[in-house]
């Protein structure tokens, strides 16, 4: 195949030749407080750090600052820290691993003597209710032996459970939508703790849609006989999945590595198998209640029996390009194909009424550098497809646009809390990095398929105060690195 050579000397742009299942073990330790007397719950307090595996090493953190680590003579499953002096503060702990330390425990906050710290409220497995689903509210406190209470906004009564002697959390069934919070008390007549943050429960007539994905060869222009794998992911585990094309269920081989997803295997696609595929799921306890359909995934097949289309670029004003694909057939389905070091895949689809499809690329940057071509397929039997057009190479020089960094809080962050900074850029599927002013090594790195990421500083202390910037980078299919964002200042307050 010949290569069309075109040079676009605008804005530095040049056209030229060209499953195995994973097993995970929970290691995060648990941290709770115990008091000599629940009548004076914040006097003579002992913090217990419990690991998942026996270890001789434990460490406590207070207000974001590490305390002296403890090394025991023999491994233990837990260790108790006796608090002395001013016990008010925010605590976390970690336990030893053969290769270092575990992640930090969840936050435990001890307030002043006149109030009990708020518990945490979460919903399991999801924050919605629907027929056939058993949703529960989990209220996690600070002290053992307390009584937990759940409240729905607008209700006058609490849903109360007995004392949680052996744990610091309680579970409540949730049957109604609304805004929920929970509290606890240390004795039957005692004052309530501060309420937890509010969690909203929605009532849905049907479960929300899953996500259907295809990767690798499945996202290319397919040929008869190719194998395709489609992955359907639900927002919860233990459901029944279904693959559909249009309104027809497809009974195809399937496999799974996790209870929240399924792999559908199309082992030998044929002409006519192109088009839109969706998936859905239903709960085991509601066999008639299917979720909404996923967003469709489109497959395109070509036997390359039809003539190749004509493919040409048309520069537009600004950082934009229009790619024209012309076929000798009306009413065809067109596909713009991108090829780079990451592989060859369909970039976009169009179904124009005539014989010409116009694909527009806006805000072009170095991330758009690739080889492009187009194909078309006949939507009528026998569903023939074209050979690919001549390839065009787009080469863009220069760094990509700078990202923006913003804080998700206002004012100062309390020592011992988490600080979340959001870095936003124009290019998806990149790695975001957070850097402290004057340092070259990233303090936080997040890989994301999107064009933005939350960069979280866990359990900040005075040592974390300062200015931060972010950037994004990529190694595949192209190696590039953005400039640093404008700075955002992190202030840390003790109280």
Swiss-Prot record:
Its main location: secreted. The keyword Disulfide bond applies. Residues 22-113, 114-206, 207-299, 300-397, 398-495 form the Ig-like V-type domain. Residues 1-21 form the signal peptide. One of its GO terms (cellular component) is blood microparticle. It is found in: Secreted. Keywords: Disulfide bond, Glycoprotein, Immunoglobulin domain, Repeat, Secreted, Signal. Gene3D superfamilies: Immunoglobulins (2.60.40.10). Coiled coil: none annotated. Disulfide bonds join 49-93, 139-182, 232-279, 325-374, 423-470. Glycans are attached at residues 44, 179, 363, 371. Plasma. One of its GO terms (biological process) is immune response-regulating signaling pathway. The keyword Glycoprotein applies. Interacts with CRISP3. This is Alpha-1B-glycoprotein. The gene is A1BG.
